[in-house]
């Protein structure tokens, strides 16, 4: 989906949860390949999280690939979806309290799985939204936009996106970093011996 002829949003199949939904291993790998291609080329990552159990032990390999191999953590916003299932979105105090707990949990799980530096912990971007509050549907919310803005907390995601762009040096720098990640993906796919290929990338292309 293109927005204002400048931004293209790509909703990928995701990297996790295939075992529950799909039993065809070839199809699972195809889905993952599609996702990995788009992710490696992305300027910013909106990482959608399950509100009840955001990050699992089984995610470790893919988290390492995303945030260590491709170095995408600084360009990632973690989005806790369907937060109206976890908090009273009409109660600011309850929302803030539960969001704080979830954010701390996400930081801890990431640290357990991929060992975050202090700088990464401080720079971790997490928001919690309710894209369809109370399940009332698009038609209703299009007629009640002001209420939607308040309850959905979509503005927190918009603000986090703008902040990420600034933190990463603006649009042009982000585009260059995305090219590096895409090249890493291509190179590692062609030369899958991980440690050696990483060494070659660092020595020859400064990535």
Q: Model segments located where?
A:
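Extended helical scaffolds that flank P-loop GTPase cores
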Residues: 145-207
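Globular "head" domains of long coiled-coil molecular machines
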Residues: 1-167
């Amino acid at each position: 989906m293109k927005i204002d002829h400048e931004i293209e949003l790509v909703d990928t199949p995701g990297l996790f949860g295939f075992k529950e939904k799909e039993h065809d291993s070839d199809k699972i790998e195809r889905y993952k390949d599609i996702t990995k291609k788009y992710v490696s080329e992305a300027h910013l990552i909106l990482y959608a999280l399950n509100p009840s159990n955001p990050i699992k032990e089984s995610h470790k390999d893919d988290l390492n690939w995303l945030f260590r191999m491709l170095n995408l953590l600084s360009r990632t916003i973690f989005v806790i979806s369907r937060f109206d299932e976890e908090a009273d979105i009409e109660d600011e105090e309850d929302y803030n309290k539960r969001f704080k707990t979830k954010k701390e949990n996400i930081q801890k799980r990431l640290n357990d799985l991929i060992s975050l530096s202090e700088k990464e912990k401080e720079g971790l971007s997490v928001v919690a939204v309710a894209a369809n509050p109370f399940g009332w549907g698009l038609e209703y919310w299009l007629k009640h936009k002001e209420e939607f803005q308040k309850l959905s907390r979509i503005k927190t995601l918009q603000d986090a996106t703008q902040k990420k762009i600034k933190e990463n040096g603006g649009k042009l720098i982000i585009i260059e970093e995305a090219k590096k990640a895409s090249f890493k993906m291509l190179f590692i796919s062609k030369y899958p011996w991980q440690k050696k290929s990483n060494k070659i990338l660092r020595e020859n292309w400064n990535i």
